[in-house]
């Protein structure tokens, strides 16, 4: 889902009377999505200020499941699709109990990561749930107008005719954390193959310009930028950035299919390493069978060149 967003608000929730409107829209979504199968629902607000509703749904052939719908005022549309949060079939009492536990945990500072959810619950991370909102081109001049600290940011890249995204974590004040291969000293087949099977790499703390142009050449037309988000925001911006700093000391090997920049940014945001691009069978196959020529390698590695030249390029563009 690709949409265009406006300058960011200071909160993912509503303000004043807007809170009432958000709750009304959430309950309208419950009626539209579940109809008569909705047996019980409870509205709530997370410790991070995000409105949500938890729903007990009656299954067609018996039993119940628990689902969630959230609101994020920074997204368009800002009401999420419903997603299941129970780990299996339940009785109605079990569903109500899970809703009570989740309501309590979601209201606590710190909340939880998706890799360690409360007992009986699950929070899937998949392409069908991740929303990409296109950020106005003005973000290249004024990052803090359109982004918030801890945002997961995708930069559109074209590799040998295949569209990929280079991702990172916006750290505020025009700086980003992102995961890239170390510069290759040669263009040998062995060095090229390493990018696909495990190459030396590290998390770097870069200016916005260096992040955006880490894998593409500088041109008069800047690449498209997207903000990626899961329906449930489980970490504050500060927590996301701190986790990026933690991974800066931990990550050392890059594998385009199993440990790439998107795995890094997803783990920072949700606790679960996930690659938006590698869910595509076509892209996964392309990265598996595509001959790793120097063209591909140069697109996947951090260029071994004088980065100071970027400053003059940025000023002149």
UniProtKB/Swiss-Prot annotation:
The keyword Acyltransferase applies. Changing residue 261 to A: Does not rescue the egg-laying defect of the egl-26 ku211 mutant. Changing residue 168 to E: In ku211; vulval morphology defects displaying a connection of gonad defective (Cog) phenotype where there is failure to make a proper connection between the vulval and uterine lumens. Keywords: Acyltransferase, Cell membrane, Membrane, Transferase. Changing residue 275 to E: Localizes to the cytoplasm rather than to the apical cell membrane. Does not rescue the egg-laying defect of the egl-26 ku211 mutant. Highly expressed in the cells of the spermatheca, the mouth, and the lining of the pharynx, the rectum, and the excretory canal. Also expressed in the pharyngeal intestinal junction cell. Changing residue 150 to E: In ku228 and e1952; vulval morphology defects displaying a connection of gonad defective (Cog) phenotype where there is failure to make a proper connection between the vulval and uterine lumens. The keyword 4Fe-4S does not apply. The active site is at residues 166, 178, 261. Its main location: membrane. It is found in: Apical cell membrane. Residues 156-277 form the LRAT domain. InterPro entries: LRAT_dom, Vulval_toroid_morpho-assoc. Putative acyltransferase. Plays a role in the morphogenesis of a vulval toroid cell, vulF, which is located where the vulva and the uterus connect. Not required for specifying vulval cell fate. PANTHER family: EGG-LAYING DEFECTIVE PROTEIN 26, PROTEIN CBG04856. This is Egg-laying defective protein 26. It comes from Caenorhabditis elegans.
């Amino acid at each position: 889902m690709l949409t265009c967003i406006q300058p960011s608000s200071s909160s993912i929730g509503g303000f004043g009377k807007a809170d009432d409107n958000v709750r009304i829209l959430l309950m309208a979504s419950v009626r539209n999505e579940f109809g008569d199968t909705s047996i019980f629902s409870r509205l709530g607000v997370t410790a991070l200020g995000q409105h949500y509703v938890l729903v007990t749904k009656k299954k067609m052939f018996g039993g119940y499941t628990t689902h969630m719908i959230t609101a994020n005022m920074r997204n368009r549309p800002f009401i999420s699709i419903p997603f299941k949060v129970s780990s299996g079939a339940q009785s109605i009492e079990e569903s109500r109990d899970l809703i009570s536990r989740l309501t309590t945990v979601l209201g606590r500072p710190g909340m939880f990561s998706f890799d360690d959810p409360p007992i009986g619950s699950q929070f899937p991370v998949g392409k069908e749930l991740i929303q990409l909102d296109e950020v106005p081109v003005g973000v290249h001049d004024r990052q803090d107008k359109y982004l918030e600290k801890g945002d997961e940011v995708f930069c559109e890249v074209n590799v040998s005719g295949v569209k990929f995204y280079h991702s990172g974590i916006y750290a505020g004040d025009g700086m980003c954390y992102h995961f890239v291969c170390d510069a290759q000293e040669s263009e040998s087949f062995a060095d090229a193959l390493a990018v696909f099977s495990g190459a030396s790499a590290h998390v770097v703390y870069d200016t916005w310009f260096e992040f955006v142009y880490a894998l593409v050449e500088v041109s008069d037309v800047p690449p498209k930028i997207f903000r990626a988000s899961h329906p449930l925001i489980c970490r504050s911006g500060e927590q996301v950035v701190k986790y990026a700093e933690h991974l800066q000391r931990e990550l050392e090997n890059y594998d385009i299919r199993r440990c790439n920049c998107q795995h890094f940014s997803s783990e920072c945001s949700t606790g679960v390493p996930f690659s938006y691009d590698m869910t595509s069978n076509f892209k996964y196959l392309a990265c598996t069978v595509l001959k790793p020529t120097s063209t591909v390698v140069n697109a996947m590695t951090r260029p071994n060149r004088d980065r100071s030249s970027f400053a003059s390029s940025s000023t002149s563009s």
